[in-house]
Curated annotation (Swiss-Prot):
Organism classification: Archaea, Methanobacteriati, Methanobacteriota, Thermococci, Thermococcales
Source taxon at top rank: Archaea
Originating organism: Thermococcus onnurineus (strain NA1)
Protein name: UPF0179 protein TON_1048
Alphabetical list of PANTHER family matching this protein: UPF0179 PROTEIN MJ1627 (PTHR40699:SF1)
Family: Belongs to the UPF0179 family.
């Protein structure tokens, strides 16, 4: 999986703190609001985005009421994400404004509305992976990277 951009420093639970692990950040939990580490922990992440751990820093762990006691300092990036798009937009290297396509097949939901991307995101098409069908139409499955505005 490709990753681009600057690494973000954050904290994750000790059990998740391994390179290659991906997670979706859903927003701060109640205990985070009064935590002195919230700025570096949840303050650097955007709710609803997918992150991939690149590196675990060799620093001491910190106590946390949410993560079974301990969190570790890690470097994360937003990874590339696979999404189905209109074939006319599928040009490798191009930047498009993401417009989700409707698909009634619940098993393909993750391809048509993947977690980590939002309608209207500006994304760069990294690679065209193939075709995917839904509702009698053929779409292109592409790997994209979100472009931060």
């Amino acid at each position: 999986m490709e990753v681009f951009g600057m690494a973000i420093i954050t904290l994750v639970g000790e059990k998740l703190a391994r390179p290659g692990v991906e997670f979706i950040y859903y927003g701060p939990a109640e205990p985070c609001r009064t935590c002195k580490l919230a700025g570096v922990c949840v303050g650097n992440l955007e709710p609803g985005r997918r992150y991939k751990i690149l590196r675990v820093r060799s620093m001491p762990s910190h106590s946390c009421p949410l993560h079974e006691g301990k969190v570790r300092v890690v470097e994360v990036v937003e990874p590339s994400i696979e999404v189905a798009i209109e074939p006319r937009l599928a040009i490798a290297g191009s930047v498009i404004k993401l417009s989700f396509v409707d698909c009634s097949d619940p098993e393909k939901r993750d391809l048509f509305r993947p977690e980590g991307l939002f309608e209207g995101d500006s994304v760069k098409i990294i690679e065209i992976l193939g075709d995917v069908e839904c509702n009698g139409r053929t779409y292109k499955l592409v790997k994209v990277m979100r472009k931060k505005e």
